[in-house]
Amino acid sequence: MAYVTMRELLEAGVHFGHQTRRWNPKMKKYIFGARNGIYIVDLQQTVKMFRDAYDFITDVTAQGKSVLFVGTKKQARDSVYEEANRAETYYVQNRWLGGMLTNFQTIKKTISRFEFLSTIENDGTIEDYPKKERVKMAKERVKLEACIGGISKMKNLPGAIFVIDPKNESIAVKEGKRLGIPIVAVVDTNCDPDDIDYVIPGNDDAIRSIRLFASKIADAAIEGHQRYLEKQNAGSDKDMDEAAFGGSAPVAAAVERTIESDGSDGPVVEMIRRKTIPAE
């Protein structure tokens, strides 16, 4: 369990919000005060609210569901890419395509096209096409990778969405809300927190702040997935045990005694046989 500490938040500059003239009044309850024209985030609330977000992400992945990382602005791209890959989950780091979630069946067709182009490039069969066609397909593959490369293995909708800057990722937030997918987001002083299920008040512009939160959420996803695997393995072991006993474990052993010789022509001989009685 890797909850964030006050010291980590301070060192990453999480407490620095936007200028006082650029704020959303709905964030007032998460603001400690202002200094030199900059709002200061109440980090005591951040610590508590991040703990709730962390536990939620852990619970989601412990159920075998995925988390979609979203951060398309320049400061967030590297952290989103690296931490999502570390957690072996999905991400959008360049541009959110409208309908990426709400029109997922169509997006699946685009993913299939991307997989086809990647396959023929990797196995060399692209060389069977005319040069003009090869150039065209190579450009198409690069373009698709930039848009959907991070979700190319996603077969179902995610169990949660982790967003850096919900104001910048407003389309992703709207699609998630429309589909009832819970949203966890780093919310700065200029954002509207109303559409966010798990608000993490803090700086969503500083690279260090973004990386801190992305890495911690990745830790939560990894922890939850590990729990999921442990439950799966425990279930498999139980099934194997039951199969070994024909679906039920033995609960008693009956003793059957048989007199082989009554002693008239020598010592008394008694045979003892144990019979297993399976559970009903």
Swiss-Prot record:
Gene3D superfamilies attached to this UniProt entry: Glucose-6-phosphate isomerase like protein, domain 1 (3.40.50.10490), Helix hairpin bin (1.10.287.610)
Gene: rpsB
One annotated Gene Ontology cellular component of this protein: cytosolic small ribosomal subunit
Family: Belongs to the universal ribosomal protein uS2 family.
Keyword Ribonucleoprotein found: yes
The keyword Phosphoprotein appears for this protein: no
Keywords: Ribonucleoprotein, Ribosomal protein
Pfam family, one: Ribosomal_S2
Gene Ontology MF terms in the entry: structural constituent of ribosome
Protein name in the entry: Small ribosomal subunit protein uS2
GO biological process, one term: translation
